[in-house]
């Protein structure tokens, strides 16, 4: 194939290429095979017209459009590969010449990825992370586990934040009851902020047997539009008040909450190890984010084409909705419950799309510069991990994702690891001093 690339802008150009006579013949055969079944020519049974007779009646040119549709995808892909351009989006392809017994000449208006000039991406200075576990961290986790295993006991005193009250309530707006505004024997933890702002606060200081007229105003962005911004009265009766009774911190408690330990000291050591692991993971994530952000900032990227930004938003949206469905959540039900729309979600995803695209371009440029290449073993391991994570068969993963796509993800992770692992943690003061010098 003879292909030629001519740059016409920072991210646009013209790709000239040919479709060979051999490929044209194959595509004409496919096109004839498709139309033959429905052909009607006087003197011939339907679907039994020869190619010669077809050409006599209609001319071979009648097959050109279908033949071109068959031939173009492969010919265009081959031209892109031959010229080495990084095409994005859909090209605008225009036939230049389509004659008999010669190659067909094509011209495509193509958008390509912008050029990337890398800056420093290794040994980047990032804020030092503290992964030390303090006694207060362990104590807080123990308290959390006490609360999770607390018993609820009746109290005769007035309700306080943290107590749970059992109530009946009837809500009205302008003296009229509304749907969903009434309940009986409802358990509500005061301070949980599960009800309309102000509702729970007005029950604090009241005890069992009391009736309280709770007056609140629905938020302006409340899901039910007919109630948004309106004042409501809730005739509320408190049946009982219960308080949390925390279990004693002793060896028995330790064994109750974790059957892998025998004593409270062992539980504390296990909690310390778990918190240490969590802090180290959080530290690595923070280092990675800071280092990659700086590496991207250090790079120079030409103007990003709109088509790349829209493709990113489409991919993010499809992934978001796909994750919902895999969790058994119907997207339309989700939008209804959250009082949002797909367009609003798309708008949210668009906010950082350009930065996401720039980050991907920089990471891909690092992959190319470092010469990262995923091995067959790495691709096989990636397929196994994806199959396990999404509860799919490995065959299904292979059918859904090409080796090229999998290798791309593996290599990008290698670039991210290179940036992260080579980063240097320094004190915040030193970083601020360096930023002052850069001004």
Curated annotation (Swiss-Prot):
Main localization of the protein described in the UniProt heading: cytoplasm
Domain PPIase FKBP-type: 162-247
Top-level taxon in the UniProt lineage: Bacteria
Catalytic activity: [protein]-peptidylproline (omega=180) = [protein]-peptidylproline (omega=0)
One Pfam family recorded for the sequence: Trigger_C
Top EC class of this enzyme: isomerase
Enzyme Commission number(s): 5.2.1.8
MF GO annotations: peptidyl-prolyl cis-trans isomerase activity; protein folding chaperone; ribosome binding
Keywords annotated in UniProt: Cell cycle, Cell division, Chaperone, Cytoplasm, Isomerase, Rotamase
GO cellular component terms, semicolon-separated: cytoplasm
Subcellular localization: Cytoplasm
Single Gene Ontology BP annotation: 'de novo' cotranslational protein folding
Purpose of the protein: Involved in protein export. Acts as a chaperone by maintaining the newly synthesized protein in an open conformation. Functions as a peptidyl-prolyl cis-trans isomerase.
Membership in a protein family: Belongs to the FKBP-type PPIase family. Tig subfamily.
Domain remark in the UniProt entry: Consists of 3 domains; the N-terminus binds the ribosome, the middle domain has PPIase activity, while the C-terminus has intrinsic chaperone activity on its own.
Classification via PANTHER family: TRIGGER FACTOR CHAPERONE AND PEPTIDYL-PROLYL CIS/TRANS ISOMERASE (PTHR30560), TRIGGER FACTOR-LIKE PROTEIN TIG, CHLOROPLASTIC (PTHR30560:SF3)
Protein name in UniProt: Trigger factor
Species in which this protein is naturally found: Lactobacillus delbrueckii subsp. bulgaricus (strain ATCC 11842 / DSM 20081 / BCRC 10696 / JCM 1002 / NBRC 13953 / NCIMB 11778 / NCTC 12712 / WDCM 00102 / Lb 14)
